[in-house]
Design a protein with these regions (language model features):
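Single conserved hydrophobic/aromatic residue that forms the stacking wall/gate
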Residues: 1-12
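Active-site region of the double-stranded beta-helix
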Residues: 5-6, 23-26, 33-36, 49-146, ...
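Conserved SET/PR-domain catalytic core that frames the SAM/AdoMet-binding pocket
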Residues: 10-16, 145-156
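Extended acidic/polar, glycine-enriched regions
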Residues: 13-45
Length: 207
């Protein structure tokens, strides 16, 4: 019954459920993670989704984040965080300064596994997912196309979209021991937290 109302945003379902598509076609993202308890289903209306915009064209970091399962649902979703991220304008960096969340060592960092699914506009656009597992050692990159999916369980992981294209990615974060995300920013680039407008407000939303 939750999926019958018009103007539906998103639905948080129990572990055991049946979903029936009533149209000829649809696109559905299913996000989940390991949790020890069964939780009740609830509806997330579009008007309830917390949105934050930060960065700037000058710093090539301008983007918008929609927190589908954000701080407002802290007590309802175990250790799950779900977001939509958009570059604002064409080209630019995301997930910058380089950061990671692969080790539980509070207050500096939490262990959160993450999955990205990417889309581009126009659809023939592309980007690059950068991965660096150790400081001061060479990393590597994955070229991203429309529909690419990346699973991240360790390392620094900024990404970039090519000039002339907009990038969207659906993100799923699951905490190992807690829901609130604590990101560790790479020391050599962390000073740029002071140069990117609004980034500290963005970081504070991952609760």
């Amino acid at each position: 019954d939750l999926v019958r109302s018009r103007g539906l945003g998103d639905v948080y379902k129990r572990q055991e459920c049946t979903i029936t598509c009533l149209s000829d076609s649809t696109e559905c993202f299913i996000a989940g993670g390991i949790y020890e308890k069964k939780l009740e289903a609830f509806l997330v209306q579009k008007k309830e989704i917390d949105t934050v915009q930060y960065g700037s064209d000058d710093t090539k970091t301008h983007r918008k984040i929609k927190h589908i399962l954000g701080a407002k649902h802290h007590e309802q979703v175990g250790r799950l965080l779900v977001n939509e991220l958009y570059t604002v304008g064409a080209g630019g960096w995301s997930g910058f300064p380089p950061h990671k969340h692969d080790t539980n060592r509070l207050p500096d960092e939490t262990r959160h596994d993450e999955v990205y699914n990417y889309r581009f506009r126009p659809g023939h656009g592309f980007g690059v997912q950068v991965m660096q597992y150790e400081d001061d050692k060479e990393g590597f990159g994955y070229q991203l196309f429309n529909g690419s999916t990346i699973a991240i369980d360790k390392g620094y992981h900024p990404c970039v979209v090519a000039p002339g294209y907009e990038m969207y990615y659906f993100t799923i974060l699951v905490g190992l021991s807690q829901r609130s995300l604590v990101q560790y920013f790479q020391k050599t680039h962390a000073y740029q937290l002071e140069t990117i407008p609004g980034i500290k407000d963005m970081i504070a939303k991952y609760k």
